[in-house]
């Protein structure tokens, strides 16, 4: 069968193969955040409240709901005396203070690499330095980082924003970035900031996290070998969206799916090489489900590409040790 409307059967080219990006899927921060929720439920019983989606992935959130997690956007939705978990994206100082004042039991699932940026911001503001943050307006990580201090933060999303930016003292300025940005886009904006503010201070180590960079590099390597790329990730996942953009910028059609049934057979019709990757918040079970769906469409071979092997882990918060959660 050759119709692109076919639900299964031979749609892809007869010799089609799947190329699997390496690395892909969960990063250490996401693994840690999910484990924090699961252990908190095991220790304290359901329900456990989580402020914002623990990570931006529908499958993960729905799975944790079944286990007893309740996701809220504001602390006022958490009844007094209950447990609240801050999502991997981090929260503002005001949210943290409110939770403490209300006497809520707090577990902080903020990714340690996001916390590193929070520490940088607080330190530089204590020194009287204005801070330019490169990030996406409205993203919870950006709101959390901007909310570490009361003033002196300036958000830019583009080179054009940099052109319009005016600061009180161009000699006392520093930059930080959202951890899930496009490495290439961030580099362009950083270049514009350096040109406009030559004295601008950069972090000793870039804020874009290792997992974001590794997954983008893997797509840069994979995309030129592919006729089409499928990214496993939810629409509200910043890092997953960046992977799709990275492939598209290399001239390859790229699509993002939350579930295998979202794959349009027309995407792979007649295609010989189909790249598959997954955002840092997307579980491997979804990537494997996508592979299974592509097999239904006639792809018989799967080839894992070479790439970086990640061996990163982060410690859990105090009180969530193995013996307590057993």
Curated annotation (Swiss-Prot):
Gene Ontology terms: biological process: dimethylallyl diphosphate biosynthetic process; isopentenyl diphosphate biosynthetic process, methylerythritol 4-phosphate pathway; terpenoid biosynthetic process
Residue numbers binding dimethylallyl diphosphate: 56, 89, 139, 237-239, 281
Coiled coil (residue ranges): none
Iron-sulfur listed as a keyword: yes
Swiss-Prot/TrEMBL cofactor(s): [4Fe-4S] cluster
Any one GO MF annotation of this record: metal ion binding
Enzyme Commission number, as recorded: 1.17.7.4
UniProt keyword list: 4Fe-4S, Iron, Iron-sulfur, Isoprene biosynthesis, Metal-binding, Oxidoreductase
Domain of life: Bacteria
Pathway(s) served: Isoprenoid biosynthesis; dimethylallyl diphosphate biosynthesis; dimethylallyl diphosphate from (2E)-4-hydroxy-3-methylbutenyl diphosphate: step 1/1; Isoprenoid biosynthesis; isopentenyl diphosphate biosynthesis via DXP pathway; isopentenyl diphosphate from 1-deoxy-D-xylulose 5-phosphate: step 6/6
Cofactor binding, note field: Binds 1 [4Fe-4S] cluster per subunit.
Alphabetized Pfam families for the sequence: LYTB
Binding site for [4Fe-4S] cluster: 27, 111, 209
Presence of the UniProt keyword 4Fe-4S in the record: yes
Enzyme class: oxidoreductase
Active-site residues, record numbering mapped to chain: 141 (proton donor)
Binding annotation for isopentenyl diphosphate: 56, 89, 139, 237-239, 281
PANTHER family xrefs: 4-HYDROXY-3-METHYLBUT-2-ENYL DIPHOSPHATE REDUCTASE
Similarity comment: family membership: Belongs to the IspH family.
Function per UniProt: Catalyzes the conversion of 1-hydroxy-2-methyl-2-(E)-butenyl 4-diphosphate (HMBPP) into a mixture of isopentenyl diphosphate (IPP) and dimethylallyl diphosphate (DMAPP). Acts in the terminal step of the DOXP/MEP pathway for isoprenoid precursor biosynthesis.
HAMAP family assigned to the protein according to its UniProt record, in alphabetical order: IspH
The name this protein goes by in its record: 4-hydroxy-3-methylbut-2-enyl diphosphate reductase 2
Species of origin: Burkholderia mallei (strain ATCC 23344)
Lineage, broadest ranks: Bacteria, Pseudomonadati, Pseudomonadota, Betaproteobacteria, Burkholderiales
């Amino acid at each position: 069968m050759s119709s692109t409307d076919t639900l299964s059967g031979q749609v892809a080219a007869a010799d089609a193969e799947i190329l699997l990006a390496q690395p892909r899927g969960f990063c250490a921060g996401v693994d840690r955040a999910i484990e924090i929720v699961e252990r908190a439920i095991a220790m304290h019983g359901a329900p456990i409240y989580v402020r914002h989606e623990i990570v931006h992935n529908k499958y993960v959130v729905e799975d944790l709901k079944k286990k007893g997690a309740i996701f809220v956007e504001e602390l006022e939705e958490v009844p007094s005396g209950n447990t609240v978990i801050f999502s991997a994206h981090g929260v503002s100082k005001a949210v943290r203070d409110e939770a403490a004042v209300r006497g809520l039991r707090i577990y902080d699932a903020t990714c340690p690499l996001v916390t590193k940026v929070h520490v940088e911001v607080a330190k530089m503001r204590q020194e009287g330095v204005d801070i330019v943050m490169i990030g996406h307006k409205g993203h919870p990580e950006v709101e959390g980082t901007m909310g570490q201090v009361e003033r002196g933060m300036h958000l830019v999303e583009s080179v054009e924003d940099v052109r319009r930016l005016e600061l009180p003292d161009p000699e006392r300025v520093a930059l930080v970035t959202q951890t899930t940005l496009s490495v290439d886009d961030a580099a362009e904006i950083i270049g514009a900031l350096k040109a406009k503010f030559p004295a601008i201070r950069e972090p000793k180590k870039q804020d874009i996290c290792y997992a974001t960079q590794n997954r983008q590099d893997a797509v840069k390597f994979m995309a030129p070998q592919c006729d089409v790329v499928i990214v496993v990730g939810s629409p509200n996942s910043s890092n997953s969206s960046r992977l799709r953009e990275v492939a598209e910028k290399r001239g390859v059609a790229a699509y993002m799916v939350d579930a295998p049934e979202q794959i349009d057979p027309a995407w792979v019709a007649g295609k010989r090489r189909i790249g598959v990757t997954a955002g840092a918040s997307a579980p491997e079970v979804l990537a494997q489900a996508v592979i299974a769906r592509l097999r239904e469409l006639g792809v018989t071979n799967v080839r894992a590409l070479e790439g970086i092997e990640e061996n990163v882990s982060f410690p859990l918060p105090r009180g969530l040790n193995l013996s307590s959660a057993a």
